[in-house]
Amino acid sequence: MERNNLKKITGSRWFLPVVCAVSFVFGWWYLSITTCAPLGGDDEIINLQNYYYITHTPWWQVVLTHAKEILNQLALQSPRFRPFSSPPVRSLNSWFLGDLVVYRLYILAWTYADIALTAWLTAKATHSKKLGALAFCLLPMMFSLWQDATGNSMYSYGALAQSTLLPVLLAGLCMLRWQDTHHMRWAVLSAFFMFMACGTFEIGFTYIAALFGIAWLYTGSGKVLPALRLCVAPLSGEVISFGFNMGSRLVNNLRRVGILEGQGIDIGGVSPNFDLPAVLRTWVMQMSAGFPLNAMVFGKIKPTNVQISDVICGVALAACVMAVLALLDRLPTRKENLLLFLTGLALLSAPALLIGISPKYQDGINVDWRHGYIPQTVESFGVGLMAVAVFVVLLRFVRGKNWWPKLRPVCSVLLAAGMAFSVVWQRSAARSYEKGGRAYTVFAEGVEAGLADAAGTETPVVTDYPVWGGDLEAENAFFLRYADTDTNAHSLAVWRTESHDEATVCRLGFALGSDKRTDISWLGTAADDNLDTVTGVTVYLPKQADPAGTLAYTTRAADGIETEHTQPLAELAQTKAENGGTLVTLPETAPIVGDTLRLQS
C-alpha cells in the first residue's frame, strides 16, 4: 500500500517541478555563502568607482553614456572588442555593486539563470525532461567555492563569465527552435546571441564546440552534416564578432606604430602565446579548477567550522539528485550519452584553452593546481553535464545486475552521503572568507557613519584596511563611495614604508571580535611617527553591537609604561549615526595603543 502511494506521488506531473524547486531553494542557500567574502581583485576599485558614478549621475545620462560606449566599440575605437561586457563598463547594473551581499546575490542570480538555461537546453537536446532536471539539481554542487576570491567569478568580476555563457545558451535554444520551425528569425536570434557572447568576453568564441555537441544530440542522426548545418547560425554570429575583434586589434596596433592618430595600448595579456609545454600545463591546471573539490584536495583543506546550515544544504541537495535519479526510467542511448559527455567536456576544456594560450596566465601565478582564473565557474557547467552522463552510465550498468535490487538502498545512501559531504566541505571551507568580509563591512560602515569626517580632506587618513593592496586611487574611491568625501587616504602598510613630515595624521583602524556583535572600527590622531599610538579616539559600533559591552584598550605613557583599561559603553558619550550605528568618544588619556582596541561582550 505504502509503495503504491509512493509511486503515485513520484508519478505525479508535479513531482519533478517540486524537486527542482526544492533544489533551487537549497542550492541558492548553499551558494549564498559567497556573500561572506570581501571584495577581491579589480572589484576592489571598479565596484567603488562604478557605484559612485551611478549614484551621482542621472539614469538617462548613464544609459546614454553606455550606448555611446557600445557604439564606440562597434566603431573599432577600443583595443578589445567587448561592447557587452559588464565590468569595467558603467551601466545601470552598477546599482548592484554598492553592497557586498547585494553584489554577490547579483552574481548568484546570473549563475542560476545559467543553471536553468543549461538544464533546459539539456532537456531539449536529449529529448528528456528528467535529464534536464538532473542537470538542474546537480549543477549547484559543481562549483568550486573555496578558491581565491580575486579570480573566482562566483565572487568577482560582476558575473562576467556567467553573462558570457547566458547568451550562448540562448543561442543554443534559438538554434534548436530554428530546427523545429525553420523560421529564419530563430537563426538570426541565434547568430545575434552568439555575437553578443563573443562581444562580452573572449571565451565566448570557444563555445561553438559545445553548441555543435548540442546540435548533434538534437538532430539524433548518425551523420555529422545535419548538426554542422544547424550550427551555421551561431557560427555566423561568432564570425562577425571575430571580424570586429580583429578590426579593433588592428586599429590599436596601427595607432601604436603611429600610422593612425591616437594612442594604442599593449594588450599582450590577451594575445596568444603558443609555447606548447606552457599551453598544455596552463590548460590542464585551468581545467582542474572547474572540478568542485580539486582546490581543497590540493590545498589540503579540512572540513572545519561546519554549521548546521551546511549539513541541511548538503542533505537537501543530495536528496533532490537521488529523487531525480529514481525517476530516470528511459535512459539515452550509449551514443547520445557519449555526445552529452563530450559536450560537457567541450564546455570544460574550450574556455580553459583560451586561458592556456594567454601569456598572462602561463607564468603560474594566476593559475596553478589549486586556483583557476575567471572562466573556472562556467567550466563547472561542463563538469555538471559530464556528471549527468556518468550517472547514466552507472545506472545502465547496475540495472542489469541481479544484486542491484538488494544493494540499491545501500548504494543510494552512500552516493547521497558523498554528495552531501562535498557540499558541507565546500560551504564550510568558503566560510574562511568570513573574517575578511566582516573587516570590510565594519570598516566601510564606520566610514559611512562619518567616523573620518573630522579629518577633512587635507589631513592624511591612514587606514588599517588596505583597499586594493593600498592603492591610493582605490583608497580615495573607498571614501568617495562610503562617505562622499575626497579624503586624503593612505594604506597603513604602505605608509610605514615611506617617509612623511605631516604634522597631523589620523589613523583609521578596526578590530574584529568573536562575532559580528563585537566588531568595531575607530579613528584617532597619531601620537608617534609609526602610528602605533593614537589620541582623541572615536569608536564606531555597528547597529548589531552589544549595548552592554565594554571597550578594552591599553595606554602607553611617555616612559613606555603600558596600562590596561576597560570602559563600559553605558558610561561613554554616544552619538547615533544615520546608518544605525553608534559613534562613541573615549575619554582623554595617555596615548592608546591602536592595535589593543577591542569590544568585549
Language-model region placement:
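Hydrophobic/aromatic-rich transmembrane helices and adjacent perimembrane loops
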Residues: 160-161, 358, 362-395
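Aromatic- and kink-enriched transmembrane "portal" helix at the membrane-lumen/periplasm boundary
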Residues: 100, 132-170, 174
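Intrinsically disordered, polar/acidic, low-complexity terminal segments
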Residues: 5-7, 11-134, 224-235, 252-338, ...
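Membrane-interface alpha helices of multi-pass inner-membrane proteins
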Residues: 186-202, 207
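Juxtamembrane "helix-exit" motif on the non-cytosolic side of transmembrane helices
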Residues: 32-34, 92-95, 142-154, 245-252, ...
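Perimembrane helix-loop-helix junctions
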Residues: 206-243, 247-251, 419
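Transmembrane alpha-helix segments characteristic
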Residues: 137-138, 332-363, 413-420
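Membrane-interface transmembrane helices that cradle and orient dolichyl/undecaprenyl
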Residues: 163-187, 221-222
